[in-house]
Regions:
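Feature marking well-ordered beta-strand scaffolds used for ligand recognition
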Residues: 1-174
């Protein structure tokens, strides 16, 4: 799917996005899509899944990746070096409620442990950490733990993506 409808019903084309995410309610999120400002965009496929409607786009800061759960969006703002938390109960008017700087300030990926409300982040840079953040209260974010693989043997290991599934972390490194 390349063609979308804006709020006025006009068609436009998105040819490039870094990531696409679909939440539990079926909304589509584009991250790093130049045509919608390189932040994140929310699309509603409920009327026509072949031509979803753009209902919101945040076109300020570059958003490399998002993870959504229970009306909360967690965003990896790569160049700002933070993850941000957004209240998206009203998908047409999300509200940024918090952000947190990560250790190596190049926040590439975010993924939530849904049971414990722990957000895992990875900074895509040499020797960086995978960090675990308690986001149960977005107004009081606390770092719980961190992990680095093989740093003593090879300081050039770079964490790329981190995913949480069934009490395990799956991390790609290069």
């Amino acid at each position: 799917v390349f063609d979308f409808l804006n709020a006025d019903g006009d068609s436009f084309r998105v040819t490039n996005a870094h990531t696409l995410y679909v939440d539990e309610k079926g909304f589509i999120y584009l991250s790093g899509a130049r045509e919608v400002g390189a932040g994140f965009a929310i699309l509603d496929p409920s009327i026509d899944p072949w031509q979803p409607q753009l209902i919101f786009n945040q076109n300020g800061d570059y958003m490399h990746e998002v993870h959504v759960w229970e009306d909360v969006l967690y965003g990896a703002e790569l160049f700002n070096g933070v993850f941000s938390i957004w209240d998206i109960k009203d998908r047409k008017a999300p509200k940024r409620i918090a952000d947190q700087r990560t250790a190596f300030t190049f926040t590439h990926s975010v993924w939530l442990d849904r049971k414990q409300k722990i957000l895992y982040t990875a900074d895509e840079t040499n020797g960086a950490l995978v960090e675990a953040w308690d986001v149960s209260d977005p107004y009081f974010i606390r770092k719980k733990d961190q992990f680095r693989v093989g740093f003593g043997a090879d300081p050039y290991h770079i964490p790329h993506n981190v995913f949480h599934h069934q009490d395990h972390l799956y991390i790609s490194w290069y």
